[in-house]
Structures are given as C-alpha cells and as structure tokens.
C-alpha cells in the first residue's frame, strides 16, 4: 500500500505495512477520568479518529483500542474530596467522555478497556518482569513496599525519546528516593497507604496496593492486541516517560518490539501560550461547545496537521466556522449525487495522495475547498457528491447543508418564515420601509436574508 507514516521511534516517515496483512491493530492512550475532557483530549481523539477512518477507507480492517485510566492518584483524591466511591466518579466521567466524543463525531474504538478490569493481567506482567530480573520490591517501615522497574537493566531505555540514561539521570535529583536502586526506576505496583480508601486497593503477591500507570497500558495492549502490534499513539506529552516506560516493560517481558509505528499528536496552545489551569486559559470540550458547534471544533482540529502545534483562539475558531460554512454553501447549491468515490478523479487523487502522506489533512482540506469552488462554478451534482464523500473520510460535511447553515439562530425556523412572509406582503404593497425594518431586525439577531427568483432563504450571519 502507498500509506506513509511518521514514526517517532525512527524519526522518519516510513512506508506502513501491518504485521497481519489487511489488519491494523492500534492502541492509543486514553483519558484519566477524574474530570471533564479538555481541548487537549479532543485533539488526540479527533487525530486518531481520522487515522482509523482513513485506514478503513484504505480497505484495511482496524482493531482500535483506546483505554480508560480509572485508577490514579488524582482519581482517588477527587473521589475522597467529593465523598463518593472511585467507581461512582469514574462511571460518571466515562459517560461525560462518551458524550463529548460523540458530539465531536468521534467513532467509538473497537475496545475501550478500563484499567481496573485488567489488574490480574498487570500482576502477571509484573511477575514476568520480576522473573527476568527487571523488577524488584522495596521494603517500607511497615513491611512490603512498591515494586519498581530496574531501568538500567533494559538496554534499549531512551530509544523513543532519544535520550541516554546519563542525560535522563542529569535531570533527576541525585539522591535515591523511596528505596529505589536508581532515581530513574519507575513504579509497577504501588503499595497501599493507610489513608487510602479500600476501593483503591487490590490484593497481590506484593501486598495490597494498585498498579502503576505505565504497567496498565502495557498489560491492556498485550491482552487485546498481542505482544506486538502495528500502531501505538498518544499525545506528544506521553512520549516520555509514559511510552518510553511501556517499551521497557513490554519489550523487557516479551523480547520483541511493542509497536511497529509510534505516532504522537502535537501540543495545544491557547493564544500562543501553553494551556494550563494556572494561566486561566484551560478549556473543557463542553466550554468550547457552548460557543461553537461541534463540527466547527472538529474542522478546526483537522485542518492542522496532527503533529503540528494547535493554537486555540476565538479568532481561529471563528475562521474555522466561516470556512466550514463555505463548504456547506457549495453543497447547498445542488443536491449531491450519491456515488462511490472515483479515486482516479483529479480531486480524489489529490486528496488520497495528501492523506497517504502521514495523514496530511491540511492539503486534504485544501482539496475540499478547490472542489467546492468547482461545484460553485459547474453546479455539478456528481462533484457535490464527491465533495460530501471526501469530507466524510474526515468525519465532515455529513449534515444537511440547509440545516447546518441555519443552525445556531436565536429564532426557530417557523418564526423566521413568518417574518419572511410578512416582509413579502410588505413588498407586495410597496411598504418598503416595513420590509427593510423586518430585514434589519432579523440582521440584528444574526439572521441574513437572501432574495432570489425562487424566493427568500435565510442563514446565520458569519
């Protein structure tokens, strides 16, 4: 196949070929469900939704796993603060996650494992690492302590981040903490603390406790996709230490590459500053959807390449909304024909070439605008159908054009149609002052009237 993907591990764009012919197995790190999803989560979910959609368009079967981390220090803290069980909190946040993802047009993954359902597999993997001399347990004052991974016993540590152990050690505190053999060693199993609630603890050969974050993903990926699979993805912030540690765990245990291709989506910035709660520029998906329709948000994310930084601002969202409106306006001119995509068509061929080169959505979106321009000129139902179908490859342009262009108005359609009829009556009686008043009143509410020989239509002002 002609698809090429940038591999973080090799730092190069490589021809993609799945290990099992015709079948792609992909694991993407999902959310830690202690709070509502934010824009960074939206960026990752949309990016890998586009990846799995294009793989399917390319004729491949896709098994897509996106996990849910439902046990974590932040989750425990939030549940205690709320006076609720961990399961109550995480169940509620998973429902909210699904609502946000559905709103953004994100297809559900094949599997969405929750970490707490795979604790036996995590303990088994820790046992394998212990037998291979890659894991050791510390001793605490009260007895059994944490189980840690011995980083220096794994030869390939640092290959994903491109850092040597000495470089990594230079960034750490010199003293050995919590009984670790080395400051770089990371926890596989956290021993329970007396202050923690009972639902944050599991029995194990190492004493009561809970799994570390990194072992969760290694165990779930192996259980659902096998010891080696095709694509491992996540945000750029996960490259180190999370994904580096996954490699150490899985490859240390099984002696084979965890994933053939490592993909990382870029960071999100807000008005060219890092998004953070302390700066007051931290937005949940729901806060953004209160201001902008979901397809505009999806389009805003997609028109930037997944590896590039994404800069959020109201001006950029406004521009995305107006740009998407231009595409829908073309589809509103002529009813799109329902036809299969002809990949020999010059527009379709350009679109495919863009997507086959590391999921090049900026160029693919540019093709959509060129195609929309041709639809505007030719009024071709076939080209309109192609525009809608190519947009569908990205999860865009599937709403009824008229409905999309009218969405978001303060007045409902019936009220606006009554005013349009009153304006038409005023014009018939040559009461042009009244006709102008109605037009201007609607314009003041963000409704633009468009007169044509076929009658008057309306849309929301850009």
Swiss-Prot record:
Pfam families found in the cross-reference section: CysS_C (PF23493), DALR_2 (PF09190), tRNA-synt_1e (PF01406)
Obligatory cofactor(s): Zn(2+)
Cofactor note: Binds 1 zinc ion per subunit.
Reaction catalysed by this enzyme: tRNA(Cys) + L-cysteine + ATP = L-cysteinyl-tRNA(Cys) + AMP + diphosphate
Binding site for ATP: 277
Single GO MF descriptor: cysteine-tRNA ligase activity
InterPro entries per UniProt: Cys-tRNA-ligase (IPR015803), Cys-tRNA-synt_Ia_DALR (IPR015273), Cys-tRNA/MSH_ligase (IPR024909), CysS_C (IPR056411), Rossmann-like_a/b/a_fold (IPR014729), tRNA-synt_1_cat_dom (IPR032678), tRNAsynth_Ia_anticodon-bd (IPR009080)
Gene Ontology biological process: cysteinyl-tRNA aminoacylation
KW Protein biosynthesis (keyword) present: yes
Amino-acid positions noted as binding Zn(2+) in the UniProt annotation, renumbered to this chain: 29, 217, 242, 246
UniProt-listed Enzyme Commission number(s): 6.1.1.16
Compartment list: Cytoplasm
GO cellular component: cytosol
Primary localisation category: cytoplasm
SUPFAM superfamilies xref list: Anticodon-binding domain of a subclass of class I aminoacyl-tRNA synthetases, Nucleotidylyl transferase
EC class of the enzyme, as a word: ligase
Keywords attached to this entry: Aminoacyl-tRNA synthetase, ATP-binding, Cytoplasm, Ligase, Metal-binding, Nucleotide-binding, Protein biosynthesis, Zinc
'KMSKS' region (motif): residue ranges: 274-278
Residues spanned by motif 'HIGH' region: 31-41
Oligomer and partners: Monomer.
Family recorded in the similarity comment: Belongs to the class-I aminoacyl-tRNA synthetase family.
HAMAP family xrefs: Cys_tRNA_synth (MF_00041)
Protein name, entry field: Cysteine--tRNA ligase
Organism name: Polaromonas sp. (strain JS666 / ATCC BAA-500)
């Amino acid at each position: 196949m002609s698809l090429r993907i940038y591999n973080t591990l090799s730092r190069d764009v490589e021809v993609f070929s799945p290990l099992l012919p015709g079948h792609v197995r992909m694991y993407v790190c999902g959310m830690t469900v202690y709070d509502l999803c934010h824009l960074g989560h939206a960026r990752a979910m949309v990016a890998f939704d586009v990846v799995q959609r294009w793989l399917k368009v390319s004729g491949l079967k896709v098994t897509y796993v996106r996990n849910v981390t439902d046990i974590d220090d932040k989750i425990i803290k939030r549940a205690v603060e709320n006076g609720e069980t961990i399961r109550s909190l995480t169940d509620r946040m998973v429902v909210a996650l699904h609502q946000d993802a559905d709103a953004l047009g994100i297809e559900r993954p094949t599997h969405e494992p929750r970490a707490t359902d795979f604790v036996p597999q995590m303990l088994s993997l820790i046992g394998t690492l212990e037998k291979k001399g890659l894991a050791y347990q510390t001793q605490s004052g009260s007895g059994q302590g944490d189980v840690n991974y011995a980083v220096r016993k794994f030869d390939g540590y640092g290959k994903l981040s491109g850092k040597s152990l000495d470089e990594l050690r230079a960034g750490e505190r010199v003293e050995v903490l919590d009984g670790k053999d080395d400051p770089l060693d990371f926890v596989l199993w956290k021993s329970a603390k007396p202050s923690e609630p009972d639902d944050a603890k599991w029995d194990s050969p190492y004493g009561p406790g809970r799994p570390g974050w990194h072992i969760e993903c290694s165990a779930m990926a192996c259980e659902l996709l096998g010891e080696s699979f095709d694509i491992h993805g996540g945000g750029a912030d996960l490259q180190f230490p999370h994904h580096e540690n996954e490699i150490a765990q899985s490859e240390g245990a099984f002696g084979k590459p965890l994933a053939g291709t490592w993909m990382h989506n870029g960071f999100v910035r807000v008005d060219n500053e890092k998004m953070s709660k302390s700066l007051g520029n931290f937005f949940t998906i729901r806060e953004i959807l209160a201001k902008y329709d979901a397809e505009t948000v999806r389009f805003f994310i997609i028109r930037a390449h997944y590896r590039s930084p994404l800069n959020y601002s109201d001006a950029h969202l406004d521009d995305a909304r107006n740009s998407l409106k231009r595409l829908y306006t073309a589809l509103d001119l002529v009813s799109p024909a329902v036809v299969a995509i002809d990949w020999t068509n010059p527009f379709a061929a350009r679109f495919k070439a863009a997507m086959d080169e590391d999921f090049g959505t900026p160029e693919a979106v540019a093709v959509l605008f060129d195609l929309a321009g041709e639809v505007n000129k030719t009024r071709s139902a076939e080209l309109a159908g192609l525009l809608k179908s190519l947009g569908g490859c990205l999860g865009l342009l599937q709403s009824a054009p008229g409905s999309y262009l009218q969405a978001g108005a303060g007045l409902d359609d019936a009220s606006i149609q009554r005013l349009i009829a009153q304006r038409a009556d005023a014009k018939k009686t040559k009461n042009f002052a009244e006709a102008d008043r109605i037009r201007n009143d609607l314009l003041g509410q963000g409704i633009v009237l468009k007169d044509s020989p076929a009658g008057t239509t309306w849309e929301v002002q850009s």
